[in-house]
Amino acid sequence: MVPGEVHMSDTPSGPHPIIPRTIRLAAIPILLCWLGFTVFVSVAVPPLEAIGETRAVAVAPDDAQSMRAMRRAGKVFNEFDSNSIAMVVLESDQPLGEKAHRYYDHLVDTLVLDQSHIQHIQDFWRDPLTAAGAVSADGKAAYVQLYLAGNMGEALANESVEAVRKIVANSTPPEGIRTYVTGPAALFADQIAAGDRSMKLITGLTFAVITVLLLLVYRSIATTLLILPMVFIGLGATRGTIAFLGYHGMVGLSTFVVNILTALAIAAGTDYAIFLVGRYQEARHIGQNREASFYTMYRGTANVILGSGLTIAGATYCLSFARLTLFHTMGPPLAIGMLVSVAAALTLAPAIIAIAGRFGLLDPKRRLKTRGWRRVGTAVVRWPGPILATSVALALVGLLALPGYRPGYNDRYYLRAGTPVNRGYAAADRHFGPARMNPEMLLVESDQDMRNPAGMLVIDKIAKEVLHVSGVERVQAITRPQGVPLEHASIPFQISMMGATQTMSLPYMRERMADMLTMSDEMLVAINSMEQMLDLVQQLNDVTHEMAATTREIKATTSELRDHLADIDDFVRPLRSYFYWEHHCFDIPLCSATRSLFDTLDGVDTLTDQLRALTDDMNKMEALTPQFLALLPPMITTMKTMRTMMLTMRSTISGVQDQMADMQDHATAMGQAFDTAKSGDSFYLPPEAFDNAEFQQGMKLFLSPNGKAVRFVISHESDPASTEGIDRIEAIRAATKDAIKATPLQGAKIYIGGTAATYQDIRDGTKYDILIVGIAAVCLVFIVMLMITQSLIASLVIVGTVLLSLGTAFGLSVLIWQHFVGLQVHWTIVAMSVIVLLAVGSDYNLLLVSRFKEEVGAGLKTGIIRAMAGTGAVVTSAGLVFAFTMASMAVSELRVIGQVGTTIGLGLLFDTLVVRSFMTPSIAALLGRWFWWPNMIHSRPTVPEAHTRQGARRIQPHLHRG
């Protein structure tokens, strides 16, 4: 940075070093080479912003738990292999109707065709089982979830978002339907777009600020116009180099890299130009000629610029030790960019000064003054204690705000409300919960097939346990696809449904009970008939007995008649034979009649035989009729008993039916209560449910093809990208573990991905990264300070004051942004601001301490005064330029960039105006010679008094007017 003091009363003599001599002699070729190099890297590859879009890197590392969870879910479901989620939201002022649904179906069918950008579509609205879960309660909005190619933040993911937006833009929604593309992936894509759009504005504003500051400092248009090309060319070379490396895949980029690299290149280039011009003008002011002034300038500034640049480059390279991809990829491009800026400051800027010096364009226009800073130095050495206490008190303003730091993770709040993604979020917020567009995915994978009633019981148990976690709004699973338990899936309801058939058959049963009364009446009629029959059978029995007796008498009479006729037949047989022998008997009437008489006599014999058979039958009938008569009384008694029993049974069943009806009413009420309450208690899914076509379709959404993995979609009640939302992830994990204890799924693998899970990995990774990167950067800065100052205590003071300045700056940023503006400080700010402030802040302190060391020969206190007088103006100017340059980033559309710039700007202002001006000098004054330990420094002057007075007269500020 600012050079050490040299004896400038005499023009340096002897051979000049080869590097400055070569630069002075070849100034024009060097300028042309830098111009050519800048033009080449600018036209050989696209602009840095375009390369940043194509080489954008993911936010979270591939080995993060959330990344592994999303990849695993995509693998077991054969759906996707990234963590990029986007939402397409449909909104209307009226409830969505059939036209909206047809448009939605057509849009989804069109999205399915783009398989290079869209890996999977979770289409809830089309499936009747899950449709209600994708539509808002007022029916005026619906959404579909897309899994895109590429991880969030990567170029492919951003390209996929643009592809989806193009499809949506080319669709023709019905009148009154508005369609938005939102979600985490769209949010990252819009961040990059916002950062790139703001880059030109930031750059233009930065150069405007620098121009104004240079004009105020030098009061010379010529000097300002000569410094600006140094910065412009150096900036172009730096950006072009990183763009070239990024284009060929040598470094990763992000919108943060592009913005911070540009700001650092402008600020550092301007600072180095101020140091060079200031040293050149100082040499010219004390009477050296232009050539000697050039060599004095280079000899006094080259080592400081090189040390400063290497410190910043080394500190920024420490970001490569981070695990988070966002930080890890920032290290190499920022470090390489700073090396290019340093190279330009050590070659290009001196070449321009050499060319301009030949025409006297950089000669000082007026006498330089140091009285103001000399008075500051005098006050510091006179009252070091009170000044140090006051400085610490000022630092406490920021330090006391640090405990209230609440990092912000939701990038939505760091973009303007009018960005496409925020319009989509706003539309979703009007109809859904605040976290519906940022869901979590819980995956439970086991070695058990869960496509059975037992598996469903465990799945619903997990869903209930997760739902009971504080802050969880709803859980979607196969047992609750719409976020509430399946309808009619409780044991009480199924019991009530079992009795429903009885309720339906109750009227029929009552009709049959009425039939039983009819049957009883009919049985009574039958009984009466049988009693009459008994009386008739009794009479029939008597008649039968008489008929049997008469038949036996007739048989006896007939037998006697046959015997007498037989006697007659025997007597007239010869005569009888004549009638049978006569051939013409039938022609003779008397013969024929007589023959018929004899045939009649033969019939008496037949009649006798038949009467004998009839007599046998009558005897049997006479025997059976009493038996039949004996059967009728028991039958009548039995029928009377049956009738009595039927009437009793009818009365009993009627009472039971009334009781069953009452019981069924209670069961139905209980089932309806469980169904209405949707509590999920007593959940049970019968086996026949698995044959339902809609349920089978739902299983494809929530269960893997082999049935051994189940996923849950979890929505938070509040912002998932918040400290509370992030803390909720471990609670969800613990609830899941508790739910599967002592179940067939015990020991199953649990994965959680999504917004809060991703930011949990980021938060945990940030803690590690800040620790590692911070320690590495502090150690690097301390080593550089130790090598340059060769004093352990001085190096510790430099590092300590820088750390104090860093804490104060961050606290002030928290105070301004979080408490005044009302926007939490983004989680990336700590790491990005720490590195820059460590490097730049230590450089300013190093400059001051180096000047202390040069002037210590005049005595400790006198040396401090002279160092303050000699460096105060130039360091203040450089610090203000750097601070305002970084603060110019506050105009960015991306408020994260604005917070980075304001945090670094506040730190540099505090470091320049308080730490370097009061705190470090007061500490040096208080410690005295111990400040230089282990070096031996005398408190008294060690140079002749004349030389001391001459040195006092030589002290002039390097650039600024007092």
Curated annotation (Swiss-Prot):
NADP listed as a keyword: no
Membrane topology: Multi-pass membrane protein
Membrane-traversing stretches: 25-45, 201-223, 225-247, 256-276, 302-322, 335-355, 383-403, 768-788, 796-816, 820-840, 867-887, 895-915
InterPro entries cross-referenced by the UniProt entry: MMPL_dom (IPR004869), MmpL_fam (IPR004707), Mycobact_MmpL (IPR050545)
Protein name (Swiss-Prot/TrEMBL): Probable transport protein MmpL9
GO cellular component, one term: extracellular region
Subcellular location(s) of the protein: Cell membrane
Cited Pfam families: MMPL
Family, per entry: Belongs to the resistance-nodulation-cell division (RND) (TC 2.A.6) family. MmpL subfamily.
Keywords (A to Z) from UniProt: Cell membrane, Membrane, Transmembrane, Transmembrane helix, Transport
